[in-house]
Amino acid sequence: EMSFMIDETGQRILRLIDVHKDQIIAFAEDIAAHPEPGYEEFCTAGKTAEVLKNLGYKVTEHLARTGVKGTKSIKEGPSLTVIGELDAIGYHSHPNANPVTGVAHACGHHAQMAAMIGCAIAMADPDVQKCLAGTVNFLAVPAEEYIDADKRARLKKEGIEFCCGKSEMIRTGVFDDTDIALTTHVHMVPVEEDFYLGNPACNGYSAERVTVRGKAAHGAIDPWNGVNALSITTSAIQMMGLMRETFREEDHVRLHNVIRKAGDVINSVPDEAIVETKVRAASLDKICEITDMVNRAYAGSAYAFGGKIEMEKLQGYMPIIPRAADNALIEAADDLGLNYRTVQKGDFNNA
């Protein structure tokens, strides 16, 4: 049951959402059924642009390749940007995964996009706009999930500098006119309530692409004349595993490796291996410290086998500082009678 505290404009917004409920849900289900990987969300972007145009927003497309921005200036005032993320995450075994790309909306971006569209529907109403001042932007951003280094190399030829869409949009000035950015996401910490208000602390990360150089030799006739790049890689990853006992729980360290290449043919000693390594932690100092440990593992293993390594630094993310829920969020949740809790000390998102 709604509280009497919601004003007439708020009541109208709620009615608009209810009236368009089926449209909003259908949009989410359509996006979920057609997942697309980062920087390739052409179908999702097209559907988003069409909805925003039909609502009367001034729409700009192809921002950072697939991004879409719908804008409406009402009166002089601050500029609010509501963000939705276009891409799906790699998850080949998901029942709704795209059979070609292997991505699925397992991270809930289809729900986030629907929330953005619901807000756009409400803000497009003339009676609602009469009560507002400023500019509202609806920004559908590409590539929130980290894209692999091979795709990054291809996109760099098209002028895309960053693996992640919001970073690329910051670089190209898309956020320059934004005073307030607002978004939502499915829960990333264990929460029983339906709504979780505020921002918990979150890991940042550093990423590298490591090329391991060995020496080819016949795997049966003279393997002793080779330097096995796969063995160097395996040894380095084993060292990282043995380091894990030094990681403190309060630093929230997470360490990931994906071997992209480990030789070409089975009867030759692999002379090249390619690994992508990611270090997550709660502070920049700890990210740098663990990254140095990882790099020593690669260097030490290469030295032991007589190989070489080449390292390419990839884009990372800074750790997120926790932010308490704004009073406006709490008051709105109370007025709507929602089942919620706010960010608490100790809440942490390891992603």
Predicted segments, located by residue:
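Acidic/His- and Gly-rich active-site-bordering loop/insert found
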Residues: 3-106, 110-137
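Generic structural signal for well-ordered, non-membrane alpha-helical segments
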Residues: 6, 10-13, 17-24, 41-45, ...
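Predominant activation on well-ordered alpha-helical scaffold segments within soluble catalytic domains
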Residues: 25, 46-49, 117-124, 166-171, ...
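A structural signal for isolated positions on well-ordered beta-strands in alpha/beta enzyme cores
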Residues: 81, 137-139, 256, 310
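Histidine/acidic-residue-rich, glycine-tolerant segments that coordinate divalent metal ions
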Residues: 94-104, 110-111, 126, 130-254, ...
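Metal-dependent amide/peptide-bond hydrolase catalytic core
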Residues: 231-351
